[in-house]
Every structure is written in C-alpha cells, then in structure tokens.
Amino acid sequence: MKPIRFFKPENLQLAKAILARYPLRFQSAALVPLLDLAQRQHGTWIPPTAMYEIASLAGVSIDYVHSLILAYPNDFFWRPKKPRVRICNSWMCQQAAEEQGNSNWDSQCRSVATKYGFDVENTGCLGNCFQGPAMWINDKIYGVNTKEKLVDIMEALTQKKN
C-alpha cells in the first residue's frame, strides 16, 4: 500500500531542506519546524496524515510525534475559529505599560481585539522586554504598544484577510 502524502510538493521540498539541517542521528530535532510547516499548510491544527508523514520523514514513531504535539497543545492542537492575540503578562511589560499610561493595557487590548474578531489570551514573557508592552499576533511580535497602535494593527490585519 502506497503511503498517503500530506505535504504538497513545494512543502515536501521545504521539509527535506529542514531535515537536511540536522545530522542523520538527530533528525528528530526537526519535529517542531516540521509540525509548524504542516500546520501552515493545513490551517490551524495537525491532522493524523501529517503526523504519519512527519514521523516517516524524521525516522521516529507516530507516538513520538503525537507526544510532542501533546506537549504543545496551544500550538498544535488548538483549532481556533478566529485569529488570536497573545498579550505578554510578564512584569516588565506590565511596568512598561504603566510607564506609558496604559495601566489597563490588558483590558484595552481585549476590548479592541474582540471588536475586530480576534481571540485574546495571556502568555508568558515574549522576550521583548525592552519594547514592552508586547503582544504576539500570528508570527510577529509587536512592541511599544498603545491602544491606537493596536487599532492600526487590527485594521491592517483584517484588511489583509479580506
């Protein structure tokens, strides 16, 4: 029986390029980038066909791939109906927001993001402390945020989506 291919030909080439970065004995280290590639191709979650193909490419068991997905449920098993905004809730970002006069940054962010149809969740430090308050939308981290900047970002993202 011929295995079912999950990756499109162009993404299969990317997957092979990702694997080529790692020595043969350590190709399991490529699992997170491969899962990310599969998620980008499929949408928002990792289907079983992708797990099987990734396991085959990396030379690991399907159980190993599945256990890695279970270790990162918010990244690989989450099936959002809407895009999401992750707000950094570290004390550095909270202090930066206070210094900018945004003492209620979290609630401002939530009200603006939900108005534009985004889900909002808190996250740990985004490593952008020098530009707080920080937030993470899709693959980009935004820093030195204000309510006005957030509105501009939301409008740009919703226009790009339409």
From Swiss-Prot:
The molecular function GO annotations come to: 2 iron, 2 sulfur cluster binding; metal ion binding; oxidoreductase activity
Q: What class of enzyme is it?
A: oxidoreductase
Task: Look up the record and name the cofactor or cofactors this protein needs.
Answer: [2Fe-2S] cluster
Concerning InterPro entries, the annotation shows:
NuoE-like (IPR002023), NuoE_dom (IPR042128), NuoE_N (IPR041921), Thioredoxin-like_sf (IPR036249)
- The EC number of this protein is 1.6.-.-
- Kindly list the places in or outside the cell where this protein is found, as annotated in its UniProt entry: Mitochondrion
One GO cellular component this record assigns the protein to is: mitochondrion
Annotated cofactor note: Binds 1 [2Fe-2S] cluster.
For this entry, the protein name equals NADH-ubiquinone oxidoreductase 24 kDa subunit homolog C11E3.12, mitochondrial
What is the organism of origin for this protein?
A: Schizosaccharomyces pombe (strain 972 / ATCC 24843)
> Lineage of this protein's species?
Eukaryota, Fungi, Dikarya, Ascomycota, Taphrinomycotina
